[in-house]
Structures are given as C-alpha cells and as structure tokens.
C-alpha cells in the first residue's frame, strides 16, 4: 500500500527507496510550476479584460455573426419561403432563424 501523496506525515513516517522520494520531489516541483502558470494566465486575462473594458465600444463575449438588419431581413423572407430556402438565400442557419423568430415573438408579447 502506497501512502497518500497529500499526507506528508504518511510519507515521512515510512521508509521508501530514493526513487520514490525523487518522484515525489519532481511531481511537487512540476505541480508548483503548473499552478504558477495557471495563476499567471488568469492574471493576464483579467488585466486584458480590464484594459478592454475601458473602451466604450467593448462588448464582452462572442461577437454577433449577423446584424439585426440581416436577421430582420431573413425573418421577412420567412413569410414567403421555407426555413431551408431562407437559409440557402441568406446563409443564416435554421436554428438561428428559429431562435430569432422566438425572440421576436417574445418581444412582441412583452411590448
């Protein structure tokens, strides 16, 4: 039975070959570097977001692929064409059209 890596007393209280101790040392060093690198990535990401938020045109998240005008045009095409036909004409996927149509209907209900 090997002792827990997270319990240093269990490791220190039992004699182990030098190879095992070296493995623990290397594992600990690599773990520390990995944690440090992760913290640095988080820190750089947060700094970049703070700088980007200073721009008044900043919008967090994924940019929209289609403008509202393009979506509205596609929705008007749906009055006379099928979803597949509108998809072929505009390049807007059926799922996006369905989602936009539901959103437009909800906005009409809510005012």
Curated annotation (Swiss-Prot):
Residues 1-56 form the Resolvase/invertase-type recombinase catalytic domain. It holds the Pfam family HTH_49. PROSITE patterns: RECOMBINASES_3. Residues 83-102 bind DNA. GO terms for molecular function: DNA binding; DNA strand exchange activity. Disulfide bonds: none annotated. InterPro entries: Cry35Ab1_HTH, Homeodomain-like_sf, Resolv_N, Resolvase-like_N_sf. Keywords: DNA-binding. The keyword Secreted does not apply. It comes from the Bacteria. Belongs to the site-specific recombinase resolvase family. This is Resolvase homolog YefC.
């Amino acid at each position: 039975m090997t002792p827990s890596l997270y319990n240093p007393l269990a490791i220190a209280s039992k004699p182990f070959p030098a190879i095992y101790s070296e493995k623990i040392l290397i594992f600990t060093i690599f773990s520390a570097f990995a944690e440090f690198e992760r913290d640095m990535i988080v820190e750089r990401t947060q700094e970049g977001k703070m700088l980007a938020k200073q721009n008044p045109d900043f919008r967090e998240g994924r940019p929209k692929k289609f403008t509202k005008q393009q979506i509205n045009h596609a929705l008007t095409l749906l009055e006379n064409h099928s979803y597949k036909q509108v998809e072929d004409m505009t390049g807007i996927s059926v799922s996006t059209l369905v989602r936009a149509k539901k959103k437009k209907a909800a906005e009409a209900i809510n005012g």
